[in-house]
Amino acid sequence: AACYSSDCRVKCRAMGFSSGKCIDSKCKCYK
């Protein structure tokens, strides 16, 4: 599955992280 930066950020924020980005086509969240 493709990783979209905007979707990733939204998902991460919804889980309580400050943001997220795509690395190797996976969404990675960070504090």
From Swiss-Prot:
Site (Basic residue of the functional dyad): K21
GO CC list: extracellular region
UniProt GO molecular function: potassium channel inhibitor activity; toxin activity
PROSITE patterns assigned: SCORP_SHORT_TOXIN
Disulphide bridges, residue numbers: C3-C22, C8-C27, C12-C29
Tissues and organs where the protein is expressed, per its UniProt entry: Expressed by the venom gland.
Free-text note on domains in this protein's UniProt record: Has the structural arrangement of an alpha-helix connected to antiparallel beta-sheets by disulfide bonds (CS-alpha/beta).
Assembly: Monomer.
Protein name as annotated: Potassium channel toxin alpha-KTx 19.2
